[in-house]
C-alpha cells in the first residue's frame, strides 16, 4: 500500500503517518519545509515518544519525503493508494490544485485503480470541502472519473500533539499522548477499504465529528481562554485550577446535552468521556502552550466552530448554556500580539465595541438574549 501524506509536522509524523507506517504502508510525506523534507530523507526514520500511563518510544522506519509543490509529489499522487492530510484548515484548500494535477495525470496515464483521500483536520466534513476545491481545479472532462475512482472520505481525528521542543540531537522526534481516535465515513470509500490499524469505520460520522468538536475542542479552547485570563502559560497549569476545571467541565456537559438530544449519545458514557478529556488536559508529560490552543480566535468563534456551534445547539433545544457563554466572553478577551486574528479581534472591539465584535465573529443576532449575557460576562472579566 502506497501512502502519501500532506503535512510532515507533529500531527503528520506523530499520528496519521505513524498509523500508516505501522500498517506496513510505504509512507511518503509531502511538506513545504525543505529542511524537514531533507531531514526525513536523510534519516528515513523518526522517533515518537508516547506519554501517559504506559510510556514508550516507537521508531517509525522506511519513510520518505518530497516537496509539497514539486513534480515528485505529482508522481506520488499518480501511484498512491491512499492520500491523507494534516496541514490545517487554512492550508487545505491550497493543496487542491496539486491534488487535481496529480489526479489528472493519473487518469491520463491510465491508472484507474481506486485511490482514497482523507483530510485529517479540525474541520467538519473537511474532506468534502477539499473535494469541492479539487473539482474546481480539475478540468470538467475528468470529473466523472474522479467520482468513480477517487474516494473523498470524511474523518474525525483526535490526538493531542503539542509542538516538539527544540532538540538538536533528534530534530524529527515528536511527543504524543497515548490516546488517539481516527474515525472515518465507511460509505465514502472507493474500492477496498485500506487496512489501516487504528482507523475506525462508521456510517454516522457527523455524530462523532460533533462529539469531538463539542467536547475535546470546546473544552480545550475554554481552558485556553480562561487560563490566559488567569495568567497561566500551559493547558496543564490552567486545568489544575479548580475554578477553571469546573467551568470547563460545565461547558463540556452543556455542549454534551446537545449531543444527547441530537444523536442519542448515552449521557453517562458521555460524562465519562468528558472526565477522560479532563485527564488528558492534565497529562504531566505534555507541555501544551495556551497560545497554541487559543490562536486564531476569529475562526474558533465562527458559527460552525467549537464555541458558537454548541451554543446554537443549546438555543435550538432550550438547554442551559451559561458556561459556554463564559467561554465565549473569555475568547473576546484573548490577546496575542503574534496572532493576526487575535490582533484583528481586539481591533474590532476597540473600534466598534464588544457587542458589534461578538456579532461579527459569531454570526449571532443582536436580539438573542445570550448576546447581552456574553457582553455582561465580558465586562465582569475585564
From Swiss-Prot:
Superkingdom of the source species: Bacteria
Any one GO CC term of the record: cytosol
SUPFAM superfamilies assigned to the protein according to its UniProt record, in alphabetical order: 6-phosphogluconate dehydrogenase C-terminal domain-like, NAD(P)-binding Rossmann-fold domains
Enzyme Commission identifier(s): 1.1.1.17
Pfam family, any one: Mannitol_dh_C
HAMAP family, A to Z: Mannitol_dehydrog (MF_00196)
PROSITE patterns: MANNITOL_DHGENASE
Keywords attached to this entry: NAD, Oxidoreductase
Similarity comment: family membership: Belongs to the mannitol dehydrogenase family.
Protein's UniProt name: Mannitol-1-phosphate 5-dehydrogenase
Enzyme class: oxidoreductase
Catalytic activity: D-mannitol 1-phosphate + NAD(+) = beta-D-fructose 6-phosphate + NADH + H(+)
InterPro entries xref list: 6-PGluconate_DH-like_C_sf, 6PGD_dom2, Mannitol_1_phos_5_DH, Mannitol_DH, Mannitol_DH_C, Mannitol_DH_CS, Mannitol_DH_N, NAD(P)-bd_dom_sf
